């Protein structure tokens, strides 16, 4: 191992040239898996790298759970986010399905299912608007103004499962045109004040969503699942369906949307997970 480390640290790094035609054949998933996988592999075996390499990065190796591994895993998450964002296109559509292909969709609240008592008095609060107003809308007003659009798409969970479901609702794009955000807004901060933790205590959930993704033609603010109004288990009366993102971005029981110029906080990003979560 000592000889290998010495050879590795002393050997000059030569540039690798890749033909542009080869890069063009790579899919986004190829790039993500290659980059994130390389960094994750380095994190797992990082303790075997020469100490001077860690020192050049301002780190001090301390074993498989040391700071260098956390640093590398964070870099892998950042690469995932950055590549996903860079390759995003509104022209990239996820596959759609027929009603015969619909599969069961489980209740996947991270904590306890909220008490349905919130539904009768539910309103959606809109903030960060160009008008300077803070607007409160009930579900009937939203349905009447924006009409109904249907999408049968796959919901993909970061835990490894997926389900095909028929969602109905109005496009996020329509909401943005009806209630324009403040000038130079780039983000939407979506909140659910009714979310609970595993013990049934209040645990507000919130996600950050870039407005380019909000404008994607398949992004819905859904009110129905498989032809019926949303139940509490699936985010009644209004939830986000954004099939180009992982399930954790598809926030249930939305109570507030705020448009911002700067990237807002995100529940899982604050807990060490990625923030973009593109598919």
Region locations from a protein language model:
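Generic secondary-structure transition motif, activating predominantly at the C-termini of alpha-helices
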Residues: 8-12, 146-147, 180, 225
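N-terminal secretory signal peptides
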Residues: 1-26
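Intrinsically disordered, low-complexity segments enriched in polar/charged residues with Gly/Pro
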Residues: 11-12, 18, 110-113, 129, ...
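Mature-region segments of soluble proteins
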Residues: 150-152, 170-279
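Near-N-terminal "mature-domain entry" segment
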Residues: 19-27, 32-35, 40-178, 252-265, ...
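Generic N-terminal simple sequence motifs
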Residues: 8-11, 46, 91, 239
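Intrinsically disordered, low-complexity segments enriched in small/polar residues
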Residues: 7-8, 43-44, 109, 198, ...
């Amino acid at each position: 191992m000592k000889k290998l480390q010495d050879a590795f640290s002393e050997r000059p790094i030569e540039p690798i040239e890749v033909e542009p035609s080869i890069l063009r054949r790579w899919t986004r998933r190829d790039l993500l898996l290659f980059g994130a996988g390389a960094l994750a592999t380095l994190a797992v075996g990082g303790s075997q790298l020469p100490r001077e390499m860690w020192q050049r990065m301002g780190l001090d190796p301390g074993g498989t759970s040391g700071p260098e591994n956390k640093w590398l895993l964070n870099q892998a998450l950042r690469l995932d986010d950055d590549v996903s964002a860079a390759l995003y296109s509104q022209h990239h559509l996820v596959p759609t399905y027929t009603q015969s292909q619909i599969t069961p969709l489980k209740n996947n609240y991270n904590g306890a299912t909220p008490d349905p008592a919130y539904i009768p008095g539910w309103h959606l609060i809109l903030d960060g608007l160009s008008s300077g107003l803070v607007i409160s809308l009930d579900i009937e007003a939203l349905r009447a103004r924006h009409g109904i659009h249907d999408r049968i798409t796959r919901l993909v969970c970061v835990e490894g499962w997926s389900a095909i479901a028929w969602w109905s609702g109005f496009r996020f794009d329509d909401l943005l045109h009806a209630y324009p955000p403040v000038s130079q807004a780039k983000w939407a901060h979506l909140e659910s004040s009714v979310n609970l933790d595993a013990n049934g205590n209040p645990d507000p959930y919130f996600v950050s969503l870039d407005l380019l993704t909000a404008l994607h033609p398949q992004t819905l603010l859904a009110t129905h699942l498989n032809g019926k109004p949303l139940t509490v288990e699936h985010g009644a009366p209004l939830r986000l369906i954004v099939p180009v993102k992982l399930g954790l971005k598809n926030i249930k029981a939305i109570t507030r949307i705020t448009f911002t110029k700067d990237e807002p906080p995100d529940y899982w990003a604050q807990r060490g997970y990625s923030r973009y979560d593109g598919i």
